[in-house]
Amino acid sequence: MEVHVCSVGTSLLKNSLDDDNVRKEIERLGLKDWDRLKFDDDRQNRIKENFDSLRKMLLKFIRSKGRRASAELDSLFSTFEKLKHNKSEIYVFLYSTNTSNSQLAGEVIRDYLIEEGIRSELVTVKTISSEENFYEGIVDLFDKVIYRILKFKEQDNEVYINATPGLKPESIFLTLAGLLAGADLIYYKYQEFNDVVILPSPPITIRPKYLDWLIRFAISGYTLSEKRAEELGIPVRLLEAKMLVERKGEDAYRLKDWVRKLLGIYLPIGAQNKYYRVIVEGEGERTFDNEVEAYNYMESKRKEGKNVRVEVPDRVYFLGL
């Protein structure tokens, strides 16, 4: 099976405005620039309220225009032809953001592909709307897209990433992470000369020394004190400079969530640390494999007036007096 992974932008919405009937309806709904709406624009709700009628209208538009209706369809069908892929062997894995305009475009494109005899699936990922939630969006991309690429490869499918549509920061990250996950080919359709270009898609991996440090970190606990990291030979300050770990409190470091997801490509399920570590100021640390025992010990030290830090498999707590 040839799996094409493709993000969904809003070119369909923009192009549909060239149709007089569509444009009049969109203007009537007060959605003139509906392809450029921000995630928090109140008009997203208007799209949601009229979702079914808009979906039917756009599907009719696509049927009349075919692949020219959107960047997704144009690049996909051009690549099917260039690579001589048979419809019966194609599976298109689409992903849109969780905004109403992107979801609308995604559903219509998926439905059209199915009408054309091409198996297709659509998933929704979180919108990246600011620097603050960038990494949250990347984590969601791992959960819903990158791990699916891994699964497709485990099932001996060929995986092709369409880098043409969608938002560029996510497309760049998807391309890199997709290659790490074993994607076979990256392609892009240049509108300037109306042709699909197969991009260099070398097998890539994390530098061995960084991978060793990160795996050692993950197996030892997703949060480590600086002292413990030094004992393990992990240069946490270098990893912090590379934005792979983040500082928690004065002397603790934690793997960033997206790095934990990235390590899922390399670590088997269950390889992460499951211990509970309690660090008491002035007394060192103790490790427990039972949450109740760790909690009881922590409480006893806290009642003694000690500052306590508790590290559990996926987070860290600081408890004062």
UniProtKB/Swiss-Prot annotation:
Belongs to the cOA ring nuclease family. The record marks 168 as: Transition state stabilizer. One of its GO terms (molecular function) is lyase activity. It is an enzyme of class 4 (lyase). CRISPR (clustered regularly interspaced short palindromic repeat) is an adaptive immune system that provides protection against mobile genetic elements (viruses, transposable elements and conjugative plasmids). CRISPR clusters contain spacers, sequences complementary to antecedent mobile elements, and target invading nucleic acids. CRISPR clusters are transcribed and processed into CRISPR RNA (crRNA). A nuclease that degrades cyclic oligoadenylates (cOA), second messengers that induce an antiviral state important for defense against invading nucleic acids. Its EC number is 4.6.1.-. This is CRISPR system ring nuclease SSO1393. CDD domains: Csm6_III-A (cd09742). One of its GO terms (biological process) is defense response to virus.
